[in-house]
Regions:
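Electropositive polyanion-binding surfaces
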Residues: 41, 192, 197-199, 225, ...
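Charge-lined substrate channels and their catalytic hotspots, especially those that engage the 3′ end
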Residues: 2-295, 302-348, 380, 384, ...
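A short macromolecule-binding patch
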Residues: 105-110, 171-177, 655-672
């Protein structure tokens, strides 16, 4: 038996395999010294050729500075610079990578060397010896911190065990669930499962069900699954709702006495028709000929939500309301956001207000920030306010027309100062009571929307200037700002190169205003063109992301030196922070600890991005559901993405996006040209480029993966 084993090892042990086994051995025992004899024994090398091969590899490893010869014939890991910490990134194609904390070169991690690391895990790796003409490669030796241990999927229940089948492409294997950890889950249920262990020798992680969402395919189940997938809550904690129920809605005598009274000033709200949480209202009155007082009144949420209480802690954790296609997941309990704080018509409400004195040229002659009590006279939808603007008729027509005139002046001033006018089309769905999408339509931003937008921007900027704008010899107090950095020059160059194919160009150097004006010219030029949505999307990607920070750098996209978020405390936690600090500082209070508020700003920025991703996932789900009932139908579209695995096409009629897989382009073998965003056929030289118009047929709709497959229609 021994001879057979020896012969088998001698035949099958390749140099690459022996190298990896030696590397693994030295990394597993980095402080031990080995002789050749000990190495041969550890690796079960029993033939002379294998031992000689081992000696040759050891010599190479010394030359590569991977090993050191501590005394003649005894070797030890040369650990100088070879152990690194960073983030593991798992790819669905197996090309996993490691990004070092020090920002160095990305390192390839083969699947066999990943040690069950999952996407975005914080890990420690050992760097392999550098091989000629090979990219750096390493092995995960320790998982320091899991990025995520909870996954959403569909249960497949067998007699004695179950698996969670997940469409998460960055989880290499399905999750094994012992029968006693199913929590009543049945075959076909959507569930949330937590990984509890992953033994080194096991192919699958072991998990336990922590929540059953319902039957796969049901609307509420799928919407909750999207929330769970992004780590967002889909139920409100009972103790937080109980705390909200105890908050009195009545306004106290002290509040009446301490606040500026606007109850007899014409005041109204303008919101989407399906809105329930009205957190802003406008008031207007003529002070004297040519001078108007305009009030921007914001729900005084922090009067009711005390800092450090259970409601506040939950709001801080959530940081934002989440708007899925068919529902809102509020940051605050419903009693607060839809009842006590909501500026509903004909009800006395507490507000935090910015009051402007404005002349007919749209110039702010004076402003003040005060706590108020208001009473809204009318609740307008955007459509109702728009009708007043267009016809000049309707309730409060003089007030709305005056506000609209002022808003247009404010907007013109902003754009002249270099603000960028992104006006994206928003996809909306008409859905029935079961959540089924009946039609797709585009939400337009009209004058009524822009009226509200301009006064909210003005209030936000005024609040930021009040705290941030201080004399040069003074230091501004700590405050959360909404900041937006200048575009990256390389991204602008790439954008310019891309739009050249459509006959457009932008400035990539010069002053901030010159660059932003050239971008605005581009956005004007593409209006109502077939490439509009594509060019707008690529232009947006060239911009930096706006975020929250206590370190003010201004807001490039709005062309403001000072900007914050003050106007939506019902749905954004940063606005609650701003309200509290503004109240403190207006009363003469001292500054606060910067580190604490910077951390809250970072968390809020992160949660804002997660919420946006969840919202997009819900739109994508409904698009796939909608198109799934239109299999075989033909649509016109535009190529919105070109990859090595196929073409992405966005449909003109409804902005639904799907893919024409490379395998379905069967008339030729196509080469992917990454630089020029195109596929080119080898034999017939047919070319598919980004922005090309195409006609497709809906071939497949996979709700589980939120994917649409299209087939190209040749014309």
């Amino acid at each position: 038996m021994a001879k057979k084993k020896e012969k088998k090892a001698g035949k099958r042990m390749k140099k690459s395999e022996m190298s990896e086994r030696l590397i693994s051995l030295f990394h597993t025992k980095p402080n031990e010294t080995f002789s050749l004899k000990q190495l041969s024994s550890s690796l079960n090398l029993t033939t002379h050729p294998l031992k000689m091969l081992c000696a040759d590899i050891i010599t190479e490893m010394i030359e590569d500075d991977f090993l050191q010869e501590v005394e003649k014939g005894h070797y030890k890991l040369n650990d100088h610079g070879l152990i690194m910490t960073g983030v593991f990134q798992r790819k669905s194609n197996g090309k996993n990578s490691f990004i070092p904390d020090d920002g160095g070169e990305t390192i390839f991690i083969a699947e066999r060397n990943s040690a069950h690391a999952m996407n975005n895990d914080k890990v420690k790796i050992a760097l392999f010896a550098k091989r000629k003409n090979r990219n750096p490669e390493g092995e995960v030796i320790e998982i320091l911190e899991r990025a995520n241990d909870t996954f959403v999927g569909t249960l497949k229940v067998e007699k004695f065990y179950a698996f969670l089948l997940t469409e998460n492409r960055t989880l290499a294997n399905d999750i094994f669930i012992p029968k006693d950890k199913l929590k009543g889950g049945k075959n076909g249920d959507k569930a949330v499962v937590k990984i509890v262990e992953w033994p080194e020798e096991a192919k699958n992680p072991i998990g336990q069900v922590i929540d059953i969402l319902g039957k796969a395919g049901e609307n509420t189940t799928e919407m909750h699954a999207i929330l769970a997938e992004f780590g967002l809550p889909y139920v409100y904690p009972k103790n937080v709702e109980t705390a909200a129920e105890k908050i009195p809605a009545e306004i106290s005598e002290a509040d009446y006495a301490e606040r500026e009274d606007f109850r007899n000033v014409t005041t109204f709200t303008i919101d989407p028709k399906d809105a329930k949480d009205f957190d802003d209202a406008l008031s207007i009155r003529l002070i004297k000929p040519g001078l108007w007082e305009v009030g921007v009144h914001i729900a005084d949420v922090t009067h009711y939500v005390k800092e450090g209480g259970v409601i506040d802690k939950e709001a801080e954790k959530r940081a934002t309301s989440v708007y899925l296609v068919d529902r809102t997941i509020p940051m605050l309990p419903e009693r607060l956001c839809n009842f006590i704080c909501s500026l509903r018509p004909d009800e006395e409400k507490l507000a935090f207000s910015v009051i402007f004195n404005m002349n007919e040229k749209g110039e702010v002659k004076d402003s003040r920030i005060v706590h108020t009590i208001i009473k809204s006279d009318r609740r307008f939808t955007y459509e109702e306010a728009q009708k007043v603007i267009e016809t000049g008729e309707g309730d409060y027509k003089e007030e709305i027309l005056e506000l609209n005139k002022q808003a247009q002046i404010l907007r013109k001033q902003r754009l002249a100062a270099g603000a960028i006018d992104f006006d994206r089309v928003e996809v909306k769905f008409e859905i029935d009571e079961t959540g089924k999408p009946l039609s797709v339509y585009f939400k337009e931003s009209k004058e009524a929307n822009k009226l509200i937008e301009e006064f909210m921007l003005l209030a936000n900027r005024t609040v930021a200037e009040k705290i941030g704008k201080v004399p040069k010899n003074k230091k501004a107090k700590v405050f959360p700002y909404r900041i937006h950095d200048l575009p990256d020059p390389d991204k602008l160059e790439n954008l310019n190169w891309f739009i050249n194919r459509f006959g457009y160009k932008i400035r990539t150097s010069g002053s901030k205003t010159e660059i932003s004006k050239s971008i605005n010219r581009l956005l004007d030029d593409i209006k109502n063109k077939k490439e509009q949505n594509l060019v707008e999307t690529v232009s947006l990607r060239a911009m930096q992301k706006a975020r929250y920070s206590t370190h003010n750098i201004g807001h490039y996209g709005l062309a403001f030196d000072y900007y914050t978020h003050f106007t939506s405390p019902i749905r954004r936690f940063p606005d609650m922070m701003v309200h509290r600090l503004l109240t403190r500082y207006l009363a003469g209070g001292r500054t606060v600890q910067e580190a604490k508020y910077e951390e809250l700003c970072d968390h809020s920025s992160e949660m804002e991005q997660i919420a946006a991703n969840a919202e997009r996932a819900s739109v994508k789900y409904k698009q796939v559901e909608f198109m799934g009932e239109r299999l075989g139908m033909e649509f016109d579209g535009v190529i919105s993405g070109v990859t090595e695995w196929g073409l992405y096409v966005e449909l003109n009629e409804n902005k639904c996006e799907g893919m024409i897989p490379m395998r379905d382009l069967g008339d030729d073998y196509y080469d992917f040209d990454e630089k020029n965003y195109c596929l080119t056929g080898r034999r017939h030289h047919k070319k598919f480029s980004l922005g090309d118009p195409v006609t497709i047929k809906v071939a497949r709709a996979n709700l589980e993966k939120k994917q649409l497959d299209f087939a190209l229609i040749e014309k």
